Amino acid sequence: LARVAQTQTLKLGYREDAQPFSFKGADGKPAGYSVSLCQKVAASLQSQLQLSKLDVQWVPVTAGSRMQAVTDGSVDVECGSTTRTLGREQQVDFSNTIWVEGASFVTLASASMNRVADLNGKRVGVIAGTTTDSALKSLSARGVVPVFVPIQTHTEGIAAVRTGKVDAYATDRLILVGEVLGRPSDVALKLSEDYLSIEPYALMMRRDADLRLAVNRALAQTYRSGEIIEVFRQSFPAGARPSALVEATYVLNALSE
């Protein structure tokens, strides 16, 4: 936080392919739910630090590079779709929860795959090192053993399903919704109703208690004021409503000063 104050610069990491949380919009600029929250955070930090100006620099990261980008200082805060885990907290800090999601999988609409058990023996694309990767590997305890196919990006994963390279692609459910709805194709896909895991999303940042507190103060204000509802409406399709878990997240993290 001291570096941000001294340089009057905030480096925010974003994903180019994690719709609807963090992606490159049609105008080439960062967009999405997490990006909007980080814009709220940036405005709050400028006020908290009493800066006349704050230069916000957006830095693209991937699922594979985001942790390193945070730990080596390339970005101060990562505004993506990152799941908070105790293992990751050994290396980085996290904000309070901003979303609660679950991992699922997508297949061709014509495929006879609907339940988690149907993944047994099937080629399943997944980004290595993610929480979805861990969830899939844990299925062996239930007698479900997929054939893992390494994928680099969500866009690549969806394309692999459509071209038949994999039988299914697994990642966080809402990202799959964004990818399927946001990228029309002649090849119809379907999303499983089963969940592989429950994923609490948070903003990832360098190990800095002062920065974490400042970010959480910004988020709490956004929740308390009701501004989070407008962020939600701008980020998701018309008529969409937060799940009960997400609504609880807003209430529980609307902390008072």
Which sequence ranges carry the predicted segments?
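Extended ligand-binding regions for polar small-molecule ligands
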Residues: G32-S44, S110, A117, G121-R123, ...
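Periplasmic-binding protein-like
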Residues: E16, W99-S110, T155, R173-L174, ...
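Beta->alpha turn/N-cap motifs
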Residues: Y14-A18, V59-G64, G73-T85, A109, ...
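A ligand-binding cleft/hinge motif common to bilobed small-molecule-binding domains
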Residues: G64-S65, C79-Q91, A135-S140, A160-S197, ...
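Ligand-binding cleft/hinge of the Venus flytrap
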Residues: D27, Q39-D55, T132-P150, V180-S185
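Extracytoplasmic small-molecule ligand-binding "clamshell" domains
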Residues: L1-E78
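Short helix-initiation/N-cap motifs at beta->coil->alpha
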Residues: L51-Q68, A111-S112, F148-A159, E199
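Short beta-strand-centered segments that line the small-molecule binding cleft or hinge
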Residues: R66-S81, R88-G102
